[in-house]
Amino acid sequence: TEVVAREEGESRESHETRILDTLEGYDFDLVCLDGYMRVLTDEFIDNAPTTLNVHPSLLPAFPGRDAHEQVLDAGVRMTGCTVHVVTEEVDAGPIVTQEAVPVYEDDDTDDLKQRVLYDGEFTAYPRAVRWFAENRVSVDHEAETVEIDGDTGGDFPHRRLIDDDLADTLRYGENPHQDGAVYADGTCEEANVVSAPQLNEGAKELSYNNYNDADGALNLIKEFDEPAAAVIKHTNPAGCAVADSLADAYDRALRTDAKSAFGGVVALNRECDAETAEQVVDSFKEVVIAPGYTEAALDVLTEKDNLRVLDVGELDEISETMTEKPIVGGRLVQERDLGSPDPEAFEVVTEREPTDDELETMSFAWQTLKHVKSNGIAFATGTETVGLGVGQVSRVDAVELAAKKAERDADGKSSEGAVMASDAFFPFPDGIDAAAEAGIEAVIQPGGSVNDEDVIEAADDHGMAMAFT
């Protein structure tokens, strides 16, 4: 242990030079400041390795002195602390980690100081130091950036606070006997249905179920770069397709199961044109979502009094990286599934290799299947769904349902020669047998069952191509 006390009357520059001289005899990679309360000289910053400091606010908000007073004066409901790399610009270095704490109505500066210290700094600072000790942090001093392996160093925040504002009170919740409301996250930069303006004045407001379905529909069509359309009912796709034109994509999506699409939510990933709008209003729909509309399309859509028309804006921004589900006593949080399938990474496990067309369809079906409730099965040809088996408690039942929907409800489509995607492994060969009976010729699934060999043997017996993700 070395103590380098500042002598009476000693200048800041002289004191920091003596600190550097003392440290020369040690091999170290990190300097941690705590309660130093002085701006470091440029000489110290240039000659010391990475230096960390903790600031009592969620930077870049409320930098400098009196952070707690600034927080209370601003009337915000959340503050916290920030561990950052020290740079020449005060409180502006790259952020390593942050910890949020709530602000209560009767708080004074002492209350806030204690809460930020004990609930924030005592959690965030050790976490940051541990990440450095584990070699998980890379600091680019020239670019003033920090990268942490796994974005969060492999850890979830020790505290998650919800800071949403009441956006609207709804007519009711999922059922008429339940009250309902929607809250808005003002920090969300991604296209979303909560902040989307409703363009047809006079139409009734969105319901709880409308919001739920609209969110699911929007998330599905964000998967695709080419013109895409989807129709959602009870948060499951009734159909989805990608095509050269938006109108063609909608037509193909609708014809998967027009019966189930009745009263559903339509999502489009291109500006809606008049041709597509004419198709949308040809049957009853609750909501249509798109990143813009032509004037001619709006003229068509707003003729329907109860069709809600939402403009979600550009779809190129993906800012939300976590999803969560409230449960009694807490909430489940997981990394958002933003991955796109890579056919080159598929593991072909059967004697027959999939064709290039089948690989393309596998990718499309796999992306669509992410938005189908499990147990989920998707039959697809080209880049359009043919039959969907959703939310079944056994996988073979989901296969049989997809086959039934394809045969009975699909218009001008057939499962003969189609590709099947399964959102989980097949525990037994019966799912493959049922798919073969429906005419399926290629399968994409995760694999991982103890009975994989039996399942692969069944696929080979039927002459199928099968790949594991």
Name these PLM-found stretches.
Residues 1-153:
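One-carbon transfer enzymes
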Residues 83-85, 168, 230-231, 238-240, ...:
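Short beta-strand scaffold segments in enzyme catalytic cores
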Residues 147-289, 293, 298, 304-306, ...:
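Active-site loops and adjacent core secondary-structure elements that bind or stabilize anionic groups
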Residues 192-204, 257-262, 335-350, 385-386, ...:
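Gly-rich Lys/Arg/Thr-decorated short loops/hinges at beta-loop-alpha junctions or inter-strand turns
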Residues 239-258, 384-432:
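Glycine- and Gly-Pro-enriched alpha-helical subdomains that act as flexible
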Residues 269, 282-310, 428, 433-469:
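C-terminal binding/interaction regions
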Residues 352-376:
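Short, basic/aromatic recognition patches
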